[in-house]
UniProtKB/Swiss-Prot annotation:
Any one GO CC term of the record: cytosolic large ribosomal subunit
Family per record: Belongs to the bacterial ribosomal protein bL25 family. CTC subfamily.
Gene: rplY
One function term, GO molecular function aspect: structural constituent of ribosome
Xref: InterPro entries: Rbsml_bL25/Gln-tRNA_synth_N, Ribosomal_bL25/Gln-tRNA_synth, Ribosomal_bL25_b-dom, Ribosomal_bL25_C, Ribosomal_bL25_long, Ribosomal_L25_dom, Ribosomal_uL5_bac-type
Biological function: This is one of the proteins that binds to the 5S RNA in the ribosome where it forms part of the central protuberance.
Gene Ontology biological process terms, A to Z: translation
Protein name in UniProt: Large ribosomal subunit protein bL25
Quaternary state and interactors: Part of the 50S ribosomal subunit; part of the 5S rRNA/L5/L18/L25 subcomplex. Contacts the 5S rRNA. Binds to the 5S rRNA independently of L5 and L18.
UniProt xrefs under Pfam families: Ribosomal_L25p (PF01386), Ribosomal_TL5_C (PF14693)
Length: 194
């Protein structure tokens, strides 16, 4: 996975009033925490954060911090992000400092690939699970896990245990968790004309 770089600054003051003032200046308040460090309050330009988590890697992007005193050069991933429910603006972000040689737990989106045979027969595709919790080395985090639904027939499902996963990826979800199924009746053939 591609590593990205993002500039941050240390934040000396905390609280709702300070956070509101930062957001009014298009700056997102945040915190960096992780193994071996005390949580550190930071701030990042909203446009820089949005650009960093857009595209390849998304929220699971490996981010090298630039600036921020002792945080300079640290590698983080987005652990949590709060958004304004109406506007979608990022209100706060939590960064988790990681080591490239220690496994991390992340959410990885699932992407349905192909047109299911059951859909062609008149059934309806029902996606039940949209992401999986996985554990892997940071450099092995997949952008997404593809689920091939091409051979899925009416009345059948694909479960977590049936997925073909990239090497080094351990799924933390229950293996019997359904991911996608096909419901409905097959198209009836038109009766022959007499």
């Amino acid at each position: 996975m591609e590593q990205k770089t993002m500039s941050i600054e240390l934040r000396e003051k905390n609280g709702k009033g300070v956070a509101r003032k930062l957001r009014a200046q298009d700056v997102v308040p945040g915190v960096v925490y992780g193994k071996g460090i005390e949580p550190v309050s930071v701030k990042v330009a909203a446009k820089d954060l949005a650009a960093t988590i857009a595209g390849e890697g998304g929220l699971n992007s490996l981010i090298t911090l630039s600036g921020g005193g002792s945080l300079n050069g640290n590698i983080v991933i987005v652990a949590d992000m709060q958004r304004n429910p109406l506007k979608g603006d990022i209100l706060h972000v939590d960064f988790h400092r990681i080591s490239l040689d220690e496994k991390v737990k992340v959410h990885v989106p699932l992407v349905m690939v192909g047109t299911a045979a059951g859909v062609k027969e008149g059934g309806m595709l029902d996606v039940v699970t949209y992401s999986l919790d996985v554990e892997c080395l940071p450099t092995a985090i997949p952008e997404a896990i593809n689920v091939d639904v091409t051979n899925l027939a009416i009345g059948h499902s694909i479960h977590v245990s049936e997925l073909v996963l990239p090497a080094g990826i351990k799924v933390l979800n229950d293996p019997e968790t359904p991911i996608v199924s096909i419901h409905g009746k097959a198209k009836e053939e038109a009766p022959a004309a007499e």
